[in-house]
Amino acid sequence: MTTKRTTTDGELDFLASYDATRFPRPSVAVDVVLLTVRDGAIWALLGRRDDQPHRGRWALPGGFLRIDESLDAAAGRVLRTKAGLRGVFTEQLYTFGAPKRDPRTRVISVAYYALVEPATLERIATAPHDTGLLLARLDVAWRGETGGPVAALDISGEVLPLAFDHAEILSMAVKRIRGKLDYAPIGFELLPAAFSLRDLRLVHEAILGRGLNKDSFRRRILDRGLVVPTGERAAGVGHRPPELYRFSDRSATDV
């Protein structure tokens, strides 16, 4: 039951005369880390900045929060306008608020991360018109959830210069998805609806940055009931096609 809040005359008078310029008002931005997995690595969608500051550097898709929208709505708007995506798995990641993270003014960034099948991001990054977008491979030099530097590499393996503190945001996103692998179906959005346990294991290995024992992985996934068999087998995969599975629960938030 919701209790209706009443506004007193004193509060109305206070609000009517309130000076919104009394305290500094930092800008708020929303940046989205769009991640996928392919070829044994984590990849992220980046865009080249056309304007100052950091012109020519690569940045996460983002934008400033509008005065009349929620943070989740802003993240959804960024996905639609910068990447043409709707209804993908998206979760709030972290708030980055170092005073000098943006040379223009005080800008607080609320970061989100989104998980997308590789084909989707490849299609966006290789669109026939020049979108200024690039699918970058993430070079993660640390193990587990310790955190540390993350470099973004182009297709030739060259390190891409990143704008603002976006390398730190990428690092936090990798740390988050590594930490969630044990209790959430992170791979759901990174795989087709039906997949083999090998497909799922390769996704986990790419995220963790290390190999996994095949039998132990299979046993752990099946024992926890994270996936259920579809009753079908993969087509065109030799004499003994693998059994296909689907996730039993989609614990994701769409924006």
For the regions a protein language model found, what residue spans apply to each?
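N-terminal leader/linker segments that precede catalytic domains of diphosphate-processing enzymes
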Residues: 1-255
